[in-house]
Amino acid sequence: MAEPSAPAADESAWPLLPSERTWGAARLTLTLATTAAATWCYLIGESVGGYLGFVQGAMALTAGCFVGMLLVLLAAGPACVRFGIDSVAATKPQFGTRGWVVPAVLQAVSIIGWNSLLIIFFAKSAVQLGVALGLMAPGTAGAALVPLLTILACAVIFTALRRGATGVSLVSNILFVHVFVGLWMLYLIVSHRWPELIAARPALAAPERGWNHTTGVELGIGTTLSWWPYIGAMIRMAPNGRTAVLPVMLGMCLPVPLLSLIGLAGVLVLKSSDPSEWLRTVGGPTYAVVSLGFVTAANFGTTTAGIYASAVGLRNFQALQRRSWTTLLLVTIMPVACVGIFIPELFFAKFGSFLALIGVAFAPLCGIQITDYFLLRRRRLDVRAMYTQGPGQPYWFWGGFNPAALAALTAGCATYVLLLDPLSYRSSAWYPYLTASLPAAASAALVYFLLGSLVRRAGRGGYRNPRRARHERQDAT
């Protein structure tokens, strides 16, 4: 029986060779911007609009998004760009050659959650578009169509991704125009309703102004922290760090607060973050149809990138390394389809809690990776050791797990929950001054540095012995 052939380079989790990393700055920016500009921005804007006015909300959200994106770039960027690996593979030096399963599970849950949300949003918008065009009558029939449209969307994404990273880039080239349509919608509501927009007051604002501002920043941080699962699979295609940094900050980060202003403005003035509802009021039925077409198409770019990143992440599992790309795509898409078919309304209603839970997990993870790469390893990694396991290997630690990373992740998550309950949004007295994500990242970093120093002294984890390094420098001089 013939052995299955090795997967194509961009369909594997192996490090990409320089000749395989062909995405320039323009192509990477376009792909990242299309990925970022999904309709979740409206829901993010709606969440911020519950606590802050338009100007304050825009400033807080933008600041939070850039802070979160910087954490993600510092955490996953160096290893992913240097060696052409994905986000999951980049955690092996911290968690071990078995412990990386923990970040892999976090990646899968996050991407499944986001993609489910976007597919449900697509199905709902497609139903509204059909009603607006007179193709169907409004009523309960729309709810029955949501599962069918979910299956259709998953089939289209599956077909596009049969071509690997090329499929992601192709979808981005087609859908990039929707970013400008989104900016046009923002211009419409701002230009038509500016006096009302400035005078509008948020409905859920707390008496403490500081709490409201901090929550706006926290929502921005949590939003861009959710890019950690995606970023590695995209920037590994770039030839070097100089090519990747600006596209990440301007292409993957900036569109999120900009397009979130659509939802922020809509919920403040017209009590709805969905542009397809308020554009009918602003510009009539024609504008509403244009908006629905935009909303329907916008989510494909993000969902395609998410499915691709998740499928590449699955390649890190030894049992799936030789499986066909088609099999991996099906494994990745099936959970998304099941959520969209069986529990769309329940999942859609829990978006705020899902967004907070992302910050709980990924803020500590970023703190761990930044500390390990810049402080403990001093930017030295062994890429070969990431793909070999067993006793005596550099990243084997103890049984393939690094207890320092697991303890630090637990400490970071506990810090977040102590400061802000992600489900009820009840907070401690320190939260308005600190946020929750930043202390979670800092506490995880501190615990990891202290315990990681002990791991290094024990001679585990492939760290350079600090005393030996000093002797080597002295001998060299």
Per-range role (PLM):
Residues 47-77, 99-105, 252-253, 439:
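Extracellular loop-to-transmembrane helix junctions
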Residues 61-95, 104-120, 447-459:
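Juxtamembrane transmembrane-helix boundary signature
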Residues 49-51, 78, 94, 102, ...:
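Membrane-water interface regions at transmembrane-helix termini and the short interhelical loops
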Residues 25-41, 187-194, 203-266, 285-304, ...:
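Hydrophobic, membrane-embedded alpha-helices of multi-pass small-molecule transporters
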Residues 366-447, 463-468:
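C-terminal membrane-solvent junction of multi-pass transporters and transport-like membrane proteins
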Residues 1-58, 187, 207-217, 236-241, ...:
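Membrane-interface "cap" regions at the ends of multi-pass membrane proteins
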Residues 104, 133-163, 177-187, 212-228, ...:
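Transmembrane alpha-helical segments of multi-pass small-molecule transport proteins
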